């Protein structure tokens, strides 16, 4: 267990005696790795994180952080972890420095170390120049970096992040992740994060687990999981999804492995052995059938394809994204 940062065994969480948020979740996270929990809204991602950070008790099963049981050794667990929730966790009518000062006192940072620790995390998160400004004047990315800075005050061994970049624009997301990967590489910090951003998980996570309806769907490295889907992808944007799927399924000679659809966007993804050979045949067949092809492209399998293969659905939280953006904007304005 010395090299294991987080371990769960048959973890179950039931709310109100009826809703099973987690259903037998077993995972292992190695020390020093960046580990992602991927899944749609309601998959159990936040429930799992709240159990691991000692905020919730599991209904059954066991969970360990750095070898400590999260239920019986909760005080010890909290000494070694930093946690950044999805919800707003700083005060907008205070300065960045004042926020960190409050958190340092809450966390019990020794008085003679407080100023040094605050200045250290401000420097690391590139917030020193803005430390005296009210947080309401910060951009969304700056606020998120400040929230991460609060979690770093205790010099944690594991950093838990619930949707660390939700609602941020691409540039702000990249800046946040530049800081997180630096923490991982320079300090050996274990990072455990929840996300539904496929690109984020593919780019930064060493390994991931996909949750759906409270269950582990699959676990592994992103490249390994994408290889498990196999083949190549022909992606078509069409005016008639139903007819396209019907025609494609009749093309037995193309080595078709799977067909996935996104009705909302009129997209059909055909997984085949050889996309370059299959594409012209598919286009000709569909045009002969009267299907209008708006766009066609070739790609490798993505984590979306992995999720479709193992969970039979897709990860989409656009409504939740807008909700979070609006809520954080309202709170920021006070």
Regions inferred by a protein language model and the residue ranges of each:
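ABC transporter nucleotide-binding domains
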Residues: 4-6, 13-212, 217-218
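Non-catalytic surface loops within mature trypsin-like serine protease
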Residues: 31, 129, 240, 272-274, ...
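C-terminal coupling/interaction segments
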Residues: 275-334
